[in-house]
Amino acid sequence: GFYIKEKIKGDKALNQKQTETDVIIIGGGQAALSTAYFLKRKKIPFIILDDQNQAGGAWLHAWNSLRLFSPNSWSSLPGWVMPNTEQTYPTKKEVIEYLQQYEQRYHFPIIRPVYVDHVKSEGEVLSVHAGEQTWRAKAVISATGTWSHPYIPSYPGQENFKGLQLHSAHYQNAELFKDKHVMIVGGGNSGAQILAEV
């Protein structure tokens, strides 16, 4: 199999034209870190390619007042319980800090920022391409989430609507909606939390 002979860190790895390992995880959020934890436990060589400049995944782009809707102990990643927070439901800042500490605690080999262009099958291996850089692995795990490609449904007469239509992925705070009539579409956690705020 392929093995990384030394720990990969930022610029050093980015300067390498090609890196080979057993598994490449694309994405650096909670799913990627959880996967990395179990790969490390099984001593399976891997690297994480994350397009963000720092740890935190989609939480880096969430609205300012976002909180977890469950207590920290229920929202922990494998191997390390999220430390107690000031309030029962951790804030965006507290979750990002936890994800940063989690990465550091387990010394995951993360290269960032790397925007993956495409993945191609090359017989027994997969090649992962980011610009002129290429990595090869036996397996590739997509942990990119949905934040970067939010879905906004179309509806009849949409082109005539004069108001603002905004996906929760682009919501920051309630200021834009002050003294306006607002309709929230969707009953998920994002919709419920934003509704309570606007």
What are these regions (language model features)?
Residues 57-96:
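Glycine-rich active-site loop/strand segments that organize a redox cofactor
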Residues 52:
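Residues in the short beta-alpha loop(s) of Rossmann-like NAD(P)-binding domains
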Residues 21, 44, 138-139, 179-182:
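Nucleotide donor/acceptor-binding cores
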Residues 91-148:
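Feature captures the FAD/FMN-dependent oxidoreductase FAD-binding
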Residues 20-48, 192-198:
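N-terminal Rossmann-like FAD-binding beta1-loop-alpha1 element of flavoenzymes
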Residues 35, 58, 121, 151-153, ...:
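Short glycine-/acidic-enriched loop or helix-start segments at secondary-structure transitions
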Residues 1-23, 148-169:
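Extreme N-terminal leader/targeting segments of oxidoreductases
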Residues 85, 91-94, 144-198:
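Glycine-rich dinucleotide-binding loop and its adjacent helix/turn
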